[in-house]
């Protein structure tokens, strides 16, 4: 099935346009690279319960704000993202969903189904209001694009660090713990990391 998808009519057209623009040598390399990628088998690596239990008992104190810009997100994708965040082994997080339209009702329905009280955006003005594992729904007045929508969510963040997550992405259960652990280790070494980017097993 993977090989069939490589040689679809759509891909052949793209290859032809690429060849015209970049020449036959570059086109051949691009095709070979694509075939290699299609044949790769990726295994989703979930941590076992023993690992998660250890992480719950040995967590850093760093507070992480996760900002999710959302716009007309499909319900099933949104719920999967929310579930993946709520199941984190790391306890010190808040989730801020910056909704630019078409997502608020799905967030509210998910929260009601799971017995979660959504936080109000006004609560973020006071850091003392921080509450572990809280979820804030910020309804934006208009859709200004992913960058501006993300910035609107960041402005409400009360954490020590900010993590960016797409509205249809998933986190493995240990993702935030791994990030916080890395930051904590670097801090003890006298270093401060400004940006961290995780591999596919942590995001």
Regions found by a protein language model. Give the residues of each.
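Short, acidic, metal-binding catalytic loop of nucleotide-sugar glycosyltransferases
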Residues: 82-92
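A conserved acidic beta->alpha catalytic loop
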Residues: 91, 99-111, 115-116, 142
């Amino acid at each position: 099935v993977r090989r069939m998808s490589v040689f679809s009519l759509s891909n052949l057209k793209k290859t032809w346009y690429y060849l015209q623009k970049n020449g036959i040598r570059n086109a051949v390399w691009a095709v070979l690279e694509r075939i290699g990628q299609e044949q790769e088998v990726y295994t989703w690596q979930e941590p076992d319960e023993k690992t998660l239990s250890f992480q719950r008992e040995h967590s850093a104190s760093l507070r992480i704000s996760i900002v999710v810009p959302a716009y007309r997100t499909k319900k099933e994708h949104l719920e999967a993202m929310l579930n993946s965040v709520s199941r984190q082994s790391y306890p010190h997080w808040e989730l801020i969903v910056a909704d630019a339209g078409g997502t608020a009702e799905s967030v509210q329905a998910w929260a009601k189904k799971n017995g979660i009280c959504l936080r109000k955006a006004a609560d973020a003005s006071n850091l003392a209001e921080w509450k572990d594992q809280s979820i804030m729904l910020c309804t934006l007045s208009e859709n200004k694009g992913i960058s501006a929508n993300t910035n609107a969510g960041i402005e409400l963040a009360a954490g020590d660090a900010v993590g960016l997550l797409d509205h249809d992405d998933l986190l493995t259960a240990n993702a935030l713990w791994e990030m916080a652990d890395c930051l904590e280790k670097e801090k003890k070494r006298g270093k401060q990391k400004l940006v961290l980017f995780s591999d596919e097993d942590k995001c």
